[in-house]
Structures are given as structure tokens and as C-alpha cells.
Amino acid sequence: LPIWMKLNRRVTIITRFSGIMFSLLLLGGLAACSDDNNGNDTPEPEPSTYPTTPFSKIELKEVIESDAQPVTATHTYLYNSAGRLTSYTGKQSFTAGDELFEIENTTTVEYKDHQAVITDEAGTVSTYTLNDKGYATTCTSQDMAGNTRTYTFSYLINTEDKYYLENITEKLDDGKEYSFITIDYSNFRALRIQQKVDTFEHNSTATTPSGNEIANISEIPSLFITDMYPLSMHAVAIYGKILGEPANYLITQLIPDSNGESEETTTYTYTLDNR
């Protein structure tokens, strides 16, 4: 069976670094005519060749240790029966005294003709223009105050006609370029990443061990991607494959160049089940 037809597939991935623990739960069980977890079904957008995800739910838990009390952040992405992202819910939980506090917000995703519209609870609307393959070429994001940012995207296209994000460029209201990220895929074991925000520049290398690569059969985005500005503004689009496919192998280290402010190397370890 193709991967999207395999039922009850589960993968748990855990990584610990810098006092933060991530736990990622991916739930399979997609079938072409089934409803999502809430009993609702969103029609598959046209054309049917748009990229899809082989899961009905991705849940990422992040435990952040602090001097006060630990905060648990839960990120939940829900997909319809066609494998298209329909919503994201972010929740922060912490205990103060004997009382549990929770802060929750929801972001919705709607699909139109060659468009994906992502709206968060703060009223920010991001409209992505999609090419014929379903990948975004541009995005216009406007917040409640009327501030507008525009983004352009370019991709590396492999021999299987899959798109991998190569560049994102952000411009402000006045048309000035404010930030960008460029990813070089020349060596799939060592992705070179160039990042610039305003006048700050930072380069790093995302690596996977030579000869001992971990295949990304679950098709999950690299965890570090959504921590990098301006890609951090597009986490929902990344998990919806609106900004291309995830890397073919799981990244195990993110190593900054010596020209950056941070010299800290981030290490990722993974535990996977056998299903």
C-alpha cells in the first residue's frame, strides 16, 4: 500500500536540548472518504496533484524549563481525509500555586482556486498564491492594524517533480527587503543555511550522519526550520506542505558558523517505533 493508505501508523520522535523537550506524535489513519477527527470533512482542493500529508494529526509537545515553573506548549495540526491541513491549535499550560492555567489559540486554513488562506485568532490573514503543483510562490500577510508584509518563495525541484524550499524573502510595507533565508541542497547530508534579518546575518549547517542517515519516511518538517525568522512566521504553511516538501532525512545537528552570535550546536536525537 502507498504510505498514505497505511492505517494506524504511529511515529514518536523525542529530542532534548537547551532545557527544552519536544515530543512529536503523528497519527495515521487517512482514507480517501473518511472524516477528520471532528467528524467534518473539507473537500480536496483542485487539482488533486496538490501535495498531501499521510496523517490525520500531528501533535508536537514542547516542555520549556524556567526559573519559575515549566511550561508545556502543545502544537496540534489537523488534516482532512485528503491529507490537507485544515487547522492548527497552539496551547500553553502551566501551574501557578495549585491552579492549572491554559492559553489556547486556533488558526484555520482555507483553500480556494490556487490559494491557501491562513487566519489566526489575532486576525492576521496570510494569503498564499499557489502554483499548479500546490506550492506557494508568494504570500501577503496583513494584521488587524493593517500592517502588510509580502513574501516570495523559490524552490529546488527534483527529478520526481517535488519542490523543496530554497529561498524565502520578506518585504515590509515600504517595499524594503527585511529578511531572507536561503537553503543550499548541494550536499543532502549538510544543508547550508544563510539567514539575514535586518542587518543581522547568520549562517549554519544542518547535518545528518554520513552512512547512517535516518530516512524521513514520516515526512515531518525539520524542527529547526520553524524556529528561524522569517520561516517562523509560516509554521502552519510549512506543516501543510504549502512551502514545499520536508527533507528526505532527519537532521541530527544544527551547527552555527563562527560568524554568528551563537556558537551553540543543537543536537537532535530520535526514537522511532517499528510500525
Q: Predicted segment positions?
A:
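Buried hydrophobic residues that stabilize the cores of well-folded domains
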Residues: 36-275
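C-terminal motif of bacterial Sec signal peptides marking the signal peptidase cleavage site
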Residues: 28-32
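Sec-dependent N-terminal signal peptides
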Residues: 13-23
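N-terminal secretory signal peptides that target proteins for export/translocation
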Residues: 1-15
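Generic hydrophobic-segment detector
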Residues: 9, 18-19, 124, 230
